[in-house]
Amino acid sequence: RSLTGKLVRVTELDVALGTSSPSAEQLATQANVYQMIFESYKANVPESQQSGITIWTLSDNAAEHEYWLSGDAPNLFDANYERKHAYKGVCDGIAGKDISADFSGDDWKNAYETEGEETPAE
């Protein structure tokens, strides 16, 4: 824990795999590492000093990795902008639990529906 009282921010986070074609096991490990980082941040940095965690870039698309980790798959979305296991790892880390059992999307949908209107995703 920081005794200085200064804000603590993790910036430009990514979890490199060393390949642009990771195996299912590598993807699961990547998700676990992302989850561990978020859980560790929440557990070890006092809430009053938590200033956030930013991810280096959005996806594994080659256009986003021209100068950094070219030929790797370090991010939350794959090259086609589909969520990877890492996305769930981050969500679970933020929530502090496995959210898949609790999340159907209905809560979000119901929060945005009003009578006679469609949800933004429809």
Protein language model regions, located:
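Aromatic-rich peripheral "rim/lid" segments of glycoside hydrolase catalytic domains that contact
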Residues: 1-122
